[in-house]
Curated annotation (Swiss-Prot):
Protein name: C-type lectin domain family 4 member F
Domain C-type lectin: 476-589
Recorded name of the encoding gene: CLEC4F
Residues bearing glycans: 79, 113, 207, 230, 244, 312, 385, 399
UniProt superkingdom: Eukaryota
Organism expressing this protein natively: Homo sapiens (Human)
Amino acid sequence: MDGEAVRFCTDNQCVSLHPQEVDSVAMAPAAPKIPRLVQATPAFMAVTLVFSLVTLFVVVQQQTRPVPKPVQAVILGDNITGHLPFEPNNHHHFGREAEMRELIQTFKGHMENSSAWVVEIQMLKCRVDNVNSQLQVLGDHLGNTNADIQMVKGVLKDATTLSLQTQMLRSSLEGTNAEIQRLKEDLEKADALTFQTLNFLKSSLENTSIELHVLSRGLENANSEIQMLNASLETANTQAQLANSSLKNANAEIYVLRGHLDSVNDLRTQNQVLRNSLEGANAEIQGLKENLQNTNALNSQTQAFIKSSFDNTSAEIQFLRGHLERAGDEIHVLKRDLKMVTAQTQKANGRLDQTDTQIQVFKSEMENVNTLNAQIQVLNGHMKNASREIQTLKQGMKNASALTSQTQMLDSNLQKASAEIQRLRGDLENTKALTMEIQQEQSRLKTLHVVITSQEQLQRTQSQLLQMVLQGWKFNGGSLYYFSSVKKSWHEAEQFCVSQGAHLASVASKEEQAFLVEFTSKVYYWIGLTDRGTEGSWRWTDGTPFNAAQNKAPGSKGSCPLRKYIIVNSGMGACSFIDTPPCPWILSN
C-alpha cells in the first residue's frame, strides 16, 4: 500500500492500482522480491474482502430504502386520471416537471448504457473464456516445454558422456604418441646397429678378400709345383722305361710324389670349401643388403605414415576441441534460456492465479448486483478492473508469444545440438577407426621390430660363423670342428674343450668318420672316447652312448686317438692306453 495506490509485484514486474480516472501503471521490471509478494498477497485479499462487504452493504441499503413519493408520482402518475399530479398553470410544478423529465431522460440513458454494458459484460465473458482456452493452450505448451527440457537434459547427459569418451581418447592418443616415440627411438637404435653391422661386414669382407687373394697366390704356387711334379713324373717314367735298375729309386720318388699329391688334393679340397663358404657369404651379404634396403624403405614409409597420421590426429583433436567448446557454449546458452523459461513460467502461473481470483470476484459481484445504480457503480469499478486485467492478460499473451518464440528457438537449438551430437558421434567413429589403424601400425611396428631382431641375431650368428671359419673351423653335418695345432694330453685337451663350452669330437656316423679322416692325414688327434670312471664301458664325452654293436670294442683302457680308433674299427688291432707324447685334438661345437 502506498497512499491511495495498491501495488502487486511478481518476480520481474509490478502493477499499481490507483483510484478512479487513473490507469494502472506498469512499472519497470524490478529485482525479484519474494518477501514483498508474500506481504502484498494478504493485503490484496483483505482489500478485496472489504470492497465486497461494502458493495453488499450498499446493495442491501438500495433494496430496503423506499422510493420517494415525488419520484413515484413522476414515474407512475395519477392512478385515476393518468396525468401528472400538479397543475399545469403552476410555475413551480412546471419547473419540477422539467427536472423530472430531465431525470427520466438521464435514467433512460443509464438504462441504454446498462444494456450496452451488458453486451460488454458478455464480450468480457467471451474474452475470459478465450483467455481460459489460451491459458489451457499455454499449459499444454508448458508441458511440451517440460518435455523438451527433459530431452535437453538427456542431450546434456549424452554430451557429458561424449566429453568423457573424448578425454579417454585423448589419454589413449597420448599413450599412442608415447609408444610411437619409443618405436622411433627403437628404429633409430636399429638403424645404428644395422650401420655398425654393415661396417663390420665390410671390414670382414675386406679381410676375406685379402685372405682369398693370399689363397689364390698359394693355389698358383701349388699349380706351378703340380706342373713341375708332372714334368718330374714324365721324366721318372722315361727313366723307368730306360733303366730297370733305377726302379726302386723311382718308386720311392713316386711314393714321395704321391704324398705331395695327397697334400695338393687336401689343398684343393680346402680351396673348394673356402670357395663354397665365400659364395655362401657373398649370397648372405647380398641378401642382407636387400633386407637392409627394404628395411630402410619400410622405415621411411612408416615414418611418413606415422607423421601424417599424427598430423591428422592432431588436426582432428583440435577440431573436436573446437566443437566441444562450441557445444559447451551452446549448453550454457540453453541453461540460461531454461532458467529464463522457468522464471517466466512461474510468473505466468502467478498471473494465472491472480486472473482466476479476479474472475471469481467478478462472478460473485455480478451475481450480487440487483439494482441499476449498484450495477453502474460496480460495473464502473469492474470495467476499470477489467481494463486492467485485460491489459495484464494482453501482457501475459505477449509473454506467452515470447515464450512460444523462445520455445521455437529452443527447438531449433535442440535440432542444432542433435546435429552437432551426430557429427560428434561421426567424429568419434572416425577417431575409433584411427585408433584401430594406429593399433595396426603398432602391431606392424612390433612385427618389424621382431624381424629386425631376428635379422640382427642372424647377422650376429653369421658373423660368428664367418669369424670361426676364418679362424680355421671346419663345417660338416651341422657341426663345427676345429683341428688344433697345439699338442696336449687327453685330459688337458678335454678340460680346454669344456672351458670353451664344447667337447672333444665324437664319431657318430661313417660320414663323420670319413670327414675327420680326410683332414687328419697321418697325424694323431685326440677324440672324445673314454671309459674313465666306468672301467671297460666306453662312451663319448658329449654324452652320446658308444654303440658296441656297430663298432668293435676299443680294447684296453684309455682314450683312443683318432687314427688308432679308425684302425680298431677296421679290424686291424686294438686301441690301448697310449703313453706317447701329447697329441693335437679335435674340438667339436
